[in-house]
Amino acid sequence: MPEATEHPPIGEAQTEPAQSGCPMVIKPPVEGGSNRDWWPNAVNLKMLQKDPEVIDPMDEGYDYREAVQTLDVDQLARDFDELCTNSQDWWPADFGHYGPLFIRMSWHAAGTYRVQDGRGGAGKGMQRFAPLNSWPDNVSLDKARRLLWPLKKKYGKKLSWSDLIVYAGNRAMENMGFKTAGFAFGRPDYWEPEEDVYWGAEHEWLGSQDRYAGANGDRTKLENPLGASHMGLIYVNPEGPEGNPDPIAAAIDIRETFGRMAMNDVETAALIVGGHTFGKTHGATDIVNGPEPEAAPLEQMGLGWSNPGVGIDTVSSGLEVTWTHTPTKWDNSFLEILYGNEWELFKSPAGANQWRPKDNGWANSVPMAQGTGKTHPAMLTTDLSMRMDPIYGEITRRWLDHPEELAEEYAKAWFKLLHRDMGPVQRYLGPLVPTQTWLWQDIVPAGKPLSDADVATLKGAIADSGLTVQQLVSTAWKAASSFRISDMRGGANGGRIRLQPQLGWESNEPDELAQVISKLEEIQGSSGIDVSFADLVVLGGNVGIETAAKAAGFDIEVPFSSGRGDATQEQTDVEAFSYLEPKADGFRNYVGKGLNLPAEYQLIDQANLLNLSAPQMTVLIGGLRALGITHGDSKLGVLTDTPGQLTNDYFVNLTDMGVKWAPAPADDGTYVGTDRDTGEVKYTASRVDLLFGSNSQLRALAEVYAEDDSRDKFVKDFVAAWVNVMDADRYDIGKGA
C-alpha cells in the first residue's frame, strides 16, 4: 500500500574524513563504532552469532508456540472490534474506524518479504525495530502499533507482537464485512533488529540510483535480492517511477516488485484493488513532519514524524486520496469508481501527484475522514495502472462485473501475503487455520517413521549399493542445504532433490545426481520397507559419514530422525523453488556464474540462511573437505592425503606454517600451497578455504580443530552440525531450525 546482480548483507563503512585528517570517522562502541569502521571489507561473522537467549527477556522454558494455543481467540476478536471504533484524541480514527490503518500496518509488515532470499516478512515482528519502524513508507504505523498496546498488554505472553501486527489487519477486514481465508498464529517475537538483511546501497531515503545502476532505464533490472523500487518503500512509488505519473510505466514497477514477493498478476491486482477498497492516504497540508522514530527526541517515547496536524490534518505520504464512498466497508466500489470516470492529474495539498475524476465527476460523494463534509474520490498513479495496463486491465474489468471473483482472489492473496514467510503448514497454529492448502505452501505429505530394524536393514542395503562416501554425503548435503531459515523453505523433507527444478540445478551436478537417485530408488523399491525417498537420501548421507569415520578410526552412529515424506512434481512450484538454487556453495567449493562478490561473502550468507553458527560452519567445512565433498570432484580445498576419511587433516594442514600459499598462476581466484622448504606443490584451495586461515576469528576456530587432542571433538562436532542441517526443516516433529 502506498503510505508507504546479488548482494549478501555486508556492513557499510563510514568514509567521510574527520577534521583531524583521519580517513575514517570512528565512534565509541555505544554509538555504533566497531572494527568494521577500520576494516569494512571483513566478513561479517556477527550474522552467525546464534544465542537469542542472551537478549530474550522471557523465562527459561517459555515456548510461545505453546503459550499462544491457550489464547482466547474469540475474546481477542471482541476486544479488537471494540478497539477499532474507540477513537483516541491523540490519534483520531479516520471515518471513526482504525481498521484501514491496521490493514496498512499488517500489509507493510508482511510486504517486506522477498522471494529471492526469503528475508523480510512479518514473522519476527521486525516492524517494531529500525530500520523498518522509520522507513518513510511506514509513516504513522508507529501510531497503529501504539493503539494496539492495550491488547498486547492484556494478553501478554499468549500473544506476540509478530502475530498481533498481522492479525490486526486480518480481523479489521472481517470487522468491515470481508470474509478472509483464515489466519494462523505462531510467530514468535524477536528482540533486536535483523542485521543480515540487505535493503539496498542507497544512503538516502527514497533513493533508487544504486539498485538500478547499469540498468540503462530497464526497470526490470532491479538489483537482487531487493523487492522495492526505492530505499524505504515497501513496493513502488505510488506517484509513478521516480515520481513520473505514468500509469503504464508504474505497472512495470508494480509487476517487478510484487513478483519479487512471489505474487503473480492476479494476486497483485487483487491486493491493490482489495486493499484500496478501505481507508485513505494522508497529505492534507504541506506541513513537514518531524524526524522518524529512531531519530525523534526522547520525550516522544518512540513515536516519530511529529507535526501539529492530526485527524483531518494528518500528513503521512503526502498523497491525499480517499478511494471510495464506503472506506470502512468491503464492496466493489473501488472498481466502480476506477472504471466509472475518466481521470485528470492534480496535486495534493502536500504537492504530490494524484488523480481525480474529470469534469468534477462524483463530486461530494466521498466522506471526509473527520466531521461530516464530503469530497470527490481520488486515485493514485498506481491505481490507474490497474485499469490502463493491458494485463491488469483484463483482470480487473472482469472483476468489475464479477465481484465475487475479486473477493475470492483477494482472500487467497491476502492470506498468502500474511503467511508466505511462515514456512510449512505444521507451523500454523490456532482455530482460524484454513483446511485448504495451496501450491505455494510447499506441501509435504506425511511420512511414516521407521523402526530400528528397518533403519538397520536400509543402512546395510545402502552400504552394499556400490555408492561411494562422496556420492552419499554429497547427495544428502545437496538436498538438505537447500533449506533457508529466512522463510523456512527447502530442505531434504519432501524428497524434491529428485524433482524439477532441483534435479537440473548446475550446483547439483545433474548427471551424477541422477545416478545416485536411480540407485536409491532401486533400494526403495526392493527393500520391502515403506520408506520415503527423502528418508533414504538423509540415511545415505549418514551411512557415508559413518563409513568415513570408521576409516579414520572412529566407531560412531549418526543420529537419524525418520518420517520424512515425498512430494510429487504436481505439488512442487517449479518457479518458486528456482529461487532456492544456490548461486554458490562454499561448503562444496562451488561458485556459480555472474556473482559480483567474492565467494567468502557468499559462504557467510549461506551459513546464516542454514542457521549455522560460526563454529558449526567451520567444522562442516573441514569435515566435508576431508571427505572430498567438492563440486565436480575437484581437489580444491581437499587438504588431506586420505580423502574419504573423517579426519581433522583440513585444519592441521591449513594452519601448518610449513605450507606457503600464493595465488594460482591462472589468476582464477584459486591458490596454490607449496612446501615452504622444497617448493613442492602440496594443495590447491579457494578463497573460502583461505578465509579460515586468514580471518582472525575463523582461524581461532580452525586452530581448535587442528589441535592434537581435538580429533574426537572434531568428529563429534561435525556429526552434530551435520544433523542440524539434515533436520533443519523437520517442523513436523518439532526439530526445525
From Swiss-Prot:
| Cofactor comment text | Binds 1 heme b (iron(II)-protoporphyrin IX) group per dimer.
Region annotated Disordered, chain positions: 1-33
Q: Which InterPro entries match?
A: Catalase_peroxidase, Haem_peroxidase, Haem_peroxidase_sf, Peroxidases_AS, Peroxidases_heam-ligand_BS
Its BP terms in the Gene Ontology are: cellular response to hydrogen peroxide; hydrogen peroxide catabolic process
The cross-link Tryptophyl-tyrosyl-methioninium (Tyr-Met) (with W-107) sits at 235-261
Tell me the PROSITE patterns matching this sequence: PEROXIDASE_1, PEROXIDASE_2
Q: How is it modified after translation?
A: Formation of the three residue Trp-Tyr-Met cross-link is important for the catalase, but not the peroxidase activity of the enzyme.
Single GO cellular component term: cytosol
Name the catalytic site residues. Answer: 108
Cofactors named for this entry:
heme b
As one GO molecular function, the record gives: heme binding
Q: What EC number(s) are associated with this protein in UniProt?
A: 1.11.1.21
Q: Which residues bind heme?
A: 276
Keyword field: Heme, Hydrogen peroxide, Iron, Metal-binding, Oxidoreductase, Peroxidase
Q: Which SUPFAM superfamilies match?
A: Heme-dependent peroxidases (SSF48113)
Q: Which reaction does it catalyse?
A: H2O2 + AH2 = A + 2 H2O; 2 H2O2 = O2 + 2 H2O
Chain residue numbers at which the record places covalent cross-link Tryptophyl-tyrosyl-methioninium (Trp-Tyr) (with M-261): 107-235
- Reading the lineage from the top rank, the first entry is Bacteria
Residues the record annotates as the site (Transition state stabilizer) are 104
Name the PANTHER family on file: CATALASE-PEROXIDASE (PTHR30555:SF0), HYDROPEROXIDASE I, BIFUNCTIONAL CATALASE-PEROXIDASE (PTHR30555)
Q: Which family does it belong to?
A: Belongs to the peroxidase family. Peroxidase/catalase subfamily.
HAMAP family given for it? Catal_peroxid
What's its job?
A: Bifunctional enzyme with both catalase and broad-spectrum peroxidase activity.
Q: How does it assemble?
A: Homodimer or homotetramer.
Q: What is this protein called?
A: Catalase-peroxidase 2
To which species is this protein native? Mycolicibacterium vanbaalenii (strain DSM 7251 / JCM 13017 / BCRC 16820 / KCTC 9966 / NRRL B-24157 / PYR-1)
Corresponding gene? katG2
